[in-house]
Amino acid sequence: MVHGRGALFSRLVAVLLAGSAFFLHSISQARPDEAPNVAAGRQLAFEIAKGNCLACHLFPGDAGADTLANIGPALQAIRSRFPDRARLRARLWDPTQANPNTVMPPFGKHGILRSDEIDLIIDYLYTQ
């Protein structure tokens, strides 16, 4: 039997491993009908003529998002930061409503992205 700090460390490691396994399993469980939306949203988010999110944001949860941009906040934990999808949608549609001094373009208001394209990008962002 392990005593003292060793026992505490062993229990801590076990809890962390169990929690990590549960977390990784839960984020990999996207519904099959969401997968095409996520892929399409990712493409729109990274496309220079559309979302161009990589120009300003890091995507720590996406190994294929090759950027060093740090103008805007890192796009991670989006679902927990914006549990209300409508609030995130409004932010993408016209970010000047939340922050009049933002440099982020009003993608919907200025017609850069259609309404359905914003929804696809949100589907992707919710995986981050």
Can you annotate each of these PLM segments?
Residues 39-43, 73, 86, 90, ...:
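Solvent-exposed, polar/charged alpha-helical surfaces in well-ordered, non-transmembrane soluble domains
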Residues 1-9:
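N-terminal secretory signal peptides that target proteins for export/translocation
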Residues 54, 58-93, 109:
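Gly/Gly-Pro-rich "capping" loops immediately C-terminal to redox-active cysteine motifs
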Residues 48-52, 60, 117:
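Short pre-active-site segment immediately N-terminal to redox-active cysteine/selenocysteine motifs
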Residues 97, 108-128:
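C-terminal capping alpha-helices of c-type cytochrome domains
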Residues 27-48:
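Electrostatic cytochrome c docking/interface patches
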Residues 12-22:
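Bacterial N-terminal signal peptides
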